[in-house]
């Protein structure tokens, strides 16, 4: 999660920082002895009866541990609904011995993972007022059940009221559990239909000493972090009028699917994080319970291994997808560097973040009456004209001498050192801070407890020039205002993790983008801003829930295809989307995948790039998985073909070629989901120096022809190693524009000899 769990409430600053700093999670994990619980992956179930699956787990453990009683004491969880496996307390040597068992796919230690709106859906054009809109067609998502795996939920929030909702869908098989401060009969309703808290992994990892009362936690589904409540309301929050944060961003709050049902699975806890043994159990339960989509705003750092079973979200989501349940997960918040994207398994819908067309300008008035507009969430009263000083090498001495009392401090950059210094400035009684940055990141103001504004270097230099040419420079900081619409440019923020995929570069990640900057949503009884791919993920999850109502038989891959091929490459107003990093540039597929999600287009994509179990098995073969591992994962004997399939032919709604030498031909298959008699022709935007040749030149569909395979010959004119260049391939029938991104890197020299 990194620094992405940003709370725009300075009264919550200490708690917020405790939650977002990686070091806290890591130190807590070390303190609590991370390596006691091991997760034993067995792959697909060999029995349909959960009791028989559980029995098979004991049959594996008993010989290793010497008795049934020892096996019972060791066992933490049985995973028996969506897949087979268990979590058990094992020594390192026991885990090593168990990994050699013929039925065991892999044994991995349980780990700690990190948690990674009044305007969002208006911005995306998902409007409740239009009788032809997706919301009206789906009755606001009333039949959709969205499973959220996170830090719990604050049930009293008005975002979870069930006014106007009909009966709970009959297919629901889940539970609502009571606990400390949470009464299932009182707090669950026709909106919040499921609420569980998974604690066995937590308590075993903490040796039973997780002191939840002193940490302000509850052994219940209740959310004391705020994150789970926030994301659940983004996905499926009810209509709430007059929602705002201290007067900012006022309007009607609602989720993507306002009448959808929520099932919360709490696996994340204060000062510890999210325990993977519990997270896998939550995925297992969500498969059992009958959710339509699983939303996971949790992750780690960018992966460095091909192994699906080393990725708990990747492993659990594989089995969910095999059951037809889409899994939507966050790309992570450790951007903007390349190859930082998380949750990269090709069956996961991985979500990047963008900004909204909304900003919060802060008037900064200098003593010469020049007013400069900064940015930030400043809800403090106006700071009248007061002395303006520069944060430089003399600042520490000024703090010691009390010279910062009541002043506004100008600081160039806002790195970790400056934020620590800002806390010293705050403690020394300064009245406000102005940060000057090369690329504006207003979220840094959430780290200080005084009025704060952010400007770019140009404006920062203007302020500095005024200070250097004035005997007693002064400034005034006004509260933020809310500005919506043009001329605000949409952007992929610095924190959003970028591609290419670190373990399978031919698999484009992220897949899609959604708003994740300064998103207003529910927390404990109020509404607050948070930023991160955590906030973008439930926006997509809610839209996927709506899509599953309109197309209940579409596979998770078909849904991902519809999201990608209909996405905006610009913002909804037609303006370009920029990418923030060390420099600002136009966004490309490694920033936002297929683009910004377009909810009103996604139900009618025209063509889809579909995949099923055979496609995923071909991927595993191409990723050098051996037959035995794939057979265990699948639950039956499987042999990869010889030669193994090319990962370049994996039927994704994208073409990514990380090492092109000369030329290569790739294939894709599309299925017609539009009018039966349709003719599509290609529109090609070739990457720089790359030639794309498509065959056949037309795709002619009829009542008996619903699928067509085409090839794309990719040829480079470059004769040196290049970076990635980007283009697109669009099939159009004049109504539907089925567009996929094309990313190509030419590579003549190997990285090793």
Curated annotation (Swiss-Prot):
PROSITE patterns associated with the record: SUBTILASE (PS51892), SUBTILASE_SER (PS00138)
Catalytic residues as annotated in Swiss-Prot or TrEMBL: 150 (charge relay system), 227 (charge relay system), 534 (charge relay system)
Pfam families: fn3_6, Inhibitor_I9, Peptidase_S8
Keyword Glycoprotein: yes
Keyword list, A-Z: Autocatalytic cleavage, Glycoprotein, Hydrolase, Protease, Secreted, Serine protease, Signal, Zymogen
Molecular function terms, GO-annotated: serine-type endopeptidase activity
Main location: secreted
Primary enzyme class: hydrolase
Domain of life from the UniProt record: Eukaryota
Domain Inhibitor I9: 38-115
Subcellular location: Secreted
UniProt signal peptide: 1-29
EC number assigned by the record: 3.4.21.-
Gene3D superfamilies: 2.60.40.2310, 3.50.30.30, Peptidase S8 propeptide/proteinase inhibitor I9, Peptidase S8/S53 domain
Chain residues in the propeptide: 30-116
InterPro entries: Peptidase_S8/S53_dom, Peptidase_S8/S53_dom_sf, Peptidase_S8_Ser-AS, Peptidase_S8_subtilisin-rel, Peptidases_S8_3, S8pro/Inhibitor_I9, S8pro/Inhibitor_I9_sf, SBT
Gene Ontology CC annotation, any one: extracellular region
Family the UniProt entry places it in: Belongs to the peptidase S8 family.
Entry-linked PANTHER family: PROPROTEIN CONVERTASE SUBTILISIN/KEXIN
Protein name: Subtilisin-like protease SBT3.17
Species the sequence originates in: Arabidopsis thaliana
Gene symbol of the encoding locus: SBT3.17
